[in-house]
């Protein structure tokens, strides 16, 4: 039945979202038009939507679970170290048992990577 939850992530400019998800995180663009990009990597998918109205209302935190956090961290650290979250810029073991780190873009969209 249900196979995947796919979020819409709103930005003032489509290029801001593509900078985080494509340039920093290595997602591929499956479709792009003037106000929408469908992105995907390793089965994780999202819609990047240009909408100043909704971007002003919502700056989400998104969590992506991974089975290879060390490899992913090294990749992002070499690709875009400036985007590592200032409060979560290295892999840390959390009290709930997960290992995590995060990235933060200039619009305050946060992506947390988690491995149990």
Regions found by a protein language model. Name each.
Residues 1-3, 54-58, 95:
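Short glycine-enriched loop/turn motifs at secondary-structure junctions
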Residues 14, 62-110:
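Vicinal oxygen chelate
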Residues 1-18, 62:
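N-terminal beta-strand motif that seeds the catalytic metal site of vicinal oxygen chelate
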Residues 24-29, 80-82:
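Conserved acetyl-CoA-binding loop of GNAT-fold acetyltransferases
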Residues 15-24, 101:
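Conserved active-site alpha-helix within GNAT-family acetyltransferase domains
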Residues 29-60, 110-115:
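Conserved short beta-strand elements that form part of the metal-binding/catalytic scaffold
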């Amino acid at each position: 039945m249900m196979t995947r939850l796919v979020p819409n992530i709103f930005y003032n400019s489509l290029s801001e979202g593509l900078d985080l998800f494509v340039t920093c995180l290595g997602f591929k663009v499956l479709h792009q038009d003037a106000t929408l990009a469908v992105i995907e990597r390793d089965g994780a998918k999202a819609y990047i939507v240009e909408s100043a109205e909704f971007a002003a209302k919502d700056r989400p935190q998104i969590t992506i679970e991974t089975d290879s956090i060390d490899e992913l961290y090294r990749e992002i650290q070499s690709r875009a170290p400036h985007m590592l979250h200032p409060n979560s810029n290295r892999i840390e073991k959390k009290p709930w048992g997960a290992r995590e780190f995060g990235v933060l873009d200039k619009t305050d969209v946060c992506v947390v990577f988690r491995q149990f």
